[in-house]
Structure formats: structure tokens, C-alpha cells
């Protein structure tokens, strides 16, 4: 019978969101899970063509990582990727935090949470710093969590919920509600970036912004990133974004001063030099200064 035999066609994916996700630095675990979800969706389609029953698996996720590790960026791209593959109907993302889910009075949270799930139908509900819902130990947060757990089951075929936040706090968050933990299918870790990865992220940002740097400048940027990694809460990808933004401003100031009433070549406008980059946003250790007189 024709429906007993289905040809599997493995086409090279060319969808922009998927390629953009694959191009991101690091995140091997995230990319692997994305491919598994897409493969499962394709398999369910083929089973349906064969007349077999379909299985709608839960795809709720937990993103655990420090600030600047691309959790929100990945969630936004993932919503588009899953829309392209018809896993999600609309592929939009509803982003919210504690202030968006907790009401002023008992009973309000349930209505607010329900409205968020309604808004996210056919897409992703992204809850950032979800642990803040239970940190204050007040009734409102607990009410919101209990409603979220209930709606995760009610909307499991229409909404993918992604919880995101700091690793340790997310672990404590799950321990406070067993029903919540059991409904999360994927626990994805977003590790801090290494100096090499931060420099690669800078390369991608430069390419996207139509700037470039020479090898000497790249070596300096690697050194800056290595110093940043030794600091606590340095910001990961956000640090690189700020580093580049400051470099672009310094380059602009330099070129305007150098070319007053003159002409500027396109190559110069695209080139960032080593002098344009400097450590920003982190406290430097104070250098000891010698005070006194030298013997003659």
C-alpha cells in the first residue's frame, strides 16, 4: 500500500531563522534539541500520512543561564523556527515577568495568567526570572504559579512555555513546585561564554553592522574579553555589545577630528582600530602609585 511506505526527504534547511540560530556562537545543546523537535514534528507528519495515531509531546522548556547568554534571543528565534516547520501555528512570542503575572489582590493572578496564555496561543509564552513569583512568599505569586501549572496542561497543544533565569535560582524555583517540574520537557543550560566565543560574537556583530577590524585589533579585543571573563557578572554577550557600541562612538569621534573639512574614504568608515576599543563597564583594580622623592 502506498501509505505504508513514505519517502524521507532530508532537505538542507534554508529558513532564515533556523540558519540564524545555527550561526549563533556556542549553544550546542540548544541547537541539538531544536533539531530533535523538528525531527519529531516531521515524524508525526509521516505517521499521520500512514494512518497512524499522532502523539503530541509536551515541549515546555527551562532556559538556565546568566544575563547575556542569549536566552531571550534564542526564544525569539525558536518561535520563528517552529512556525516555519508548522510546529506552532503563529510563531509569535509573549514575553512577561513577575509584574505582568501577579495582581494586586487575591484572585487576580489567575485571570491575568489565563489572559497571557490566551495571547500566546499558537506561539511561545516566555516567562523571564520566573523564580521572582515565589521569592517573596506571598499568596499572589503562589496563585500565579498554580495557575501557570494548570494552563500548561490545558494549552499543551497550543502554547510552549519557556521559563528563564539564573541557574541557581531556577533550581530552587522548580523545587518549590513538583507539578511544574514534571511538566517541563527540556532543561537547557546557557553557559557563560569563553574569551574565544566572546571574540567570535564580536566578529558576528561587526559583520552584521558592516564594520571590520584588523588582526592586531582582534588580539586586543580577545585580551579585553579575557579580562572581562575574570570578573563576576560581566554580562557575557551584553558586554560585547557595549564594547562595540563604545568603539563605534570612539571611531566616529576620531574620524571627525582627523578629517575636519576633508574627505572620508569608505574603507576608513568601516575600519575599527585597536585605539577604538577599551575596557568598559568593569571596575579596574587601582594601581599603586609611588609617593615620595628620588635620591639624587
Feature-to-residue mapping (PLM):
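Pre-Walker A (pre-P-loop) alpha-helix and adjacent loop at the N terminus of AAA/AAA+ ATPase modules
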Residues: 16-59, 80, 296
Amino acid at each position: 500500500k502506498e501509505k505504508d511506505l513514505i519517502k524521507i526527504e532530508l532537505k538542507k534547511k534554508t529558513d532564515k531563522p533556523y540558519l540564524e540560530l545555527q550561526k549563533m556562537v556556542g549553544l550546542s545543546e540548544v541547537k541539538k534539541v531544536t533539531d530533535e523537535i523538528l525531527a519529531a514534528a516531521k515524524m508525526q507528519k509521516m505517521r499521520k500520512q500512514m494512518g497512524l495515531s499522532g502523539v503530541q509531546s509536551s515541549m515546555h522548556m527551562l532556559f538556565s543561564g546568566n544575563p547575556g547568554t542569549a536566552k531571550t534571543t534564542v526564544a525569539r528565534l525558536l518561535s520563528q523556527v517552529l512556525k516555519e516547520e508548522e510546529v506552532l501555528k503563529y510563531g509569535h512570542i509573549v514575553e512577561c515577568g513577575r509584574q505582568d503575572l501577579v495582581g494586586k489582590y487575591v484572585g487576580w493572578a489567575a485571570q491575568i495568567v489565563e489572559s497571557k496564555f490566551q495571547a500566546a496561543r499558537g506561539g511561545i509564552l516566555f516567562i523571564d526570572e520566573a523564580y521572582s513569583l515565589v521569592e517573596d512568599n506571598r499568596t499572589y505569586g503562589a496563585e500565579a504559579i498554580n495557575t501557570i501549572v494548570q494552563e500548561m496542561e490545558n494549552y499543551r497543544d497550543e502554547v510552549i512555555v519557556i521559563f528563564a533565569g539564573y541557574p541557581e535560582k531556577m533550581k530552587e524555583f522548580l523545587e518549590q513546585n513538583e507539578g511544574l517540574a514534571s511538566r517541563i520537557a527540556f532543561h537547557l543550560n546557557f553557559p557563560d561564554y569563553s574569551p574565544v566565543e566572546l571574540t567570535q560574537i564580536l566578529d558576528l556583530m561587526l559583520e552584521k553592522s558592516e564594520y571590520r577590524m584588523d588582526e592586531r585589533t582582534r588580539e586586543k579585543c580577545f585580551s579585553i574579553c579575557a579580562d572581562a571573563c575574570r570578573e563576576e557578572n560581566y554580562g557575557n554577550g551584553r558586554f560585547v555589545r557595549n564594547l562595540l557600541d563604545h568603539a563605534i562612538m570612539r571611531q566616529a569621534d576620531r574620524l571627525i577630528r582627523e578629517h575636519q573639512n576633508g574627505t572620508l574614504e569608505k574603507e576608513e568608515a568601516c575600519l575599527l582600530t585597536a585605539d577604538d576599543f577599551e575596557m568598559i563597564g568593569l571596575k579596574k583594580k587601582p594601581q599603586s602609585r609611588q609617593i615620595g622623592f628620588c635620591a639624587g
